[in-house]
Amino acid sequence: MRTIEGENELLLTCMETPDGVSVLRCETRDDDVRLPDEIGGAPVVSLGGYALSERAPDLTGRDTFRVRVTCGGPEPVHDANAIRAVTLSKRLQSVGSYAFYNCRRLETLTFSGSLTEFGGDALMNCRALRHIRLHADPAAPTCLHRVLGEHAGELDVIFLHGGARIRLLFPAYSEELETLAPAHIFQRRIHGAGYGYRQCFESGVLHFRGYDLALESLLDRHDFSVAARVAVRRLAAPYQLADAARAAYLDCLRAHGGALARDCAAAGESAALSFLLSLGVLSREDIAAACDTAREKEQTAALSVLLAALGQNIPKGRAKSFDL
């Protein structure tokens, strides 16, 4: 068995392909898994079906070899539930069906623009997934639309390209099949604006104008909290943001930014509060309410930002009561 140094304890079952190496199985109990970019000088180009899943794939008859990736720890016994984050190989081209099946605690998936195929049900039962990190040009075709199509939950997506960070929110949606008796015809019903957001792609390229127009559907559904979070992300990194869309996002935050400010205050997100305040969309009442929340949650840094916006300072006596 080959052994290579890495950032994890992984036990890989691999197969050579014309383009490089395919990882058919990855056994680990690490929470942050980083697949190697190369094995034996050849690029890792595919991740097989069920590769990281709770269930092992049937590799009978395959011409495989094993690779131990180690950072000095013991040989791992696979635990799909331990996995919280996965970074795919830089030149990975395909992910097989059910690759992450029953990775129930998987929260973050990172991949590059080289990924072009994403198998059906690859994310089945990955209900904790919330973050996608994509190293790619947002103006180029990517596999993002396929990944989004495999997960109906809310996803926070970040494009990382040339030093830029373009952050987008794709809302959740749900669907159900309703039987129309007595003909036993099934009618598909979709609930939530997230499905519409997932249709904003043309030939694999995200259509930012279509994404921005989808804000109206969130407001029509009274999903004001989600709409505010969509708005603040687009305004923070206004890639291909038209003037009309910018105005719509600012109007959204004038109407619903107060609740977002309170959420940020409760979580101690000072940087987010500073940006929200810089937009000039919060009323003094909104800021005062966020101050009350920050005091209640003992978020001193957030309270400082908010009080500065009101032209006040934290009373020294109260500041001492916080756990800094």
Predicted regions and their residues:
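Structural signature of tandem-repeat unit edges
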Residues: 2, 7-20, 27-45, 56-94, ...
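Consensus positions within tandem repeat domains that build extended binding/scaffold surfaces
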Residues: 50, 96-98
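Ankyrin repeat arrays, specifically the small/polar loop and inter-repeat linker segments at the C-terminal end
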Residues: 242-256, 281-288, 301, 311-323
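Ankyrin repeat structural motif
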Residues: 268-277, 299-308, 315
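TPR/TPR-like alpha-solenoid helical repeat scaffolds
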Residues: 291-299
